[in-house]
Structures are given as C-alpha cells and as structure tokens.
Amino acid sequence: MVDGMQRANQVINLTPAEVADGLREGRLLLVDVREPNEIAVERYPEAVVVPLSHFDPADIPDPQGKQVVFACRSGRRSVTASLAAQDQGYPYNRHLAGGILAWKAAGLPTETG
C-alpha cells in the first residue's frame, strides 16, 4: 500500500488451455480487444470483438452466466480492458495471459482472412 492508495481491482491470468477448456465447456465468453485491422488478419474462434480503442464494457453482450475473459495479442491490452471494466463496476477480472501469441504457441486454432 502506497500513501493509503491501493488498487482494489485485480486481473486473474488464465492459460490458453484454461480458456480453451472454458470455451469448450460453455463457461467462458472470450472478448477480443484487438483492433479491426488485427482481427481481419487472424482471430480467435468464438470471440466477441470490442476494440480497446473505443472500449466500453457496456458493449459486451450479456454473458448469460458465463465468465468474461479478455484477450488481445500479447496480454497487455486485455489487462487494460479488464481494469477499465472493473473501474466501471463490472466483475470482469480475467484475461488470457500471453494473448493470441500464447494461444497459437499452445497449438490452439485461429481463424484467418
């Protein structure tokens, strides 16, 4: 704690395997916060796109009981999105650690084109 100020919000790191399992089991809603030009080249299957450049957590579809998990290219923007959502009162505190780079390194599928 520094000068009585501590950020209450935290972000939980999930591995690519944890996210893939959660998607397969219907427990997670994956939200890709990369920009449209990045997604046009390569994207996560089943992800909802809410670009960080104009991020509003209200734009995320109702997760209907699923846990929201943010994802990006390397894991930095997904942390930013999670913290921004939490700052606005949303309980979205999980992200894909390592982003799509880790996802692909784990041998998980992406869609291209």
Model-derived features: positions:
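Rhodanese-like catalytic fold shared by cysteine-dependent sulfurtransferases
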Residues: 1-29, 35-69, 76-113
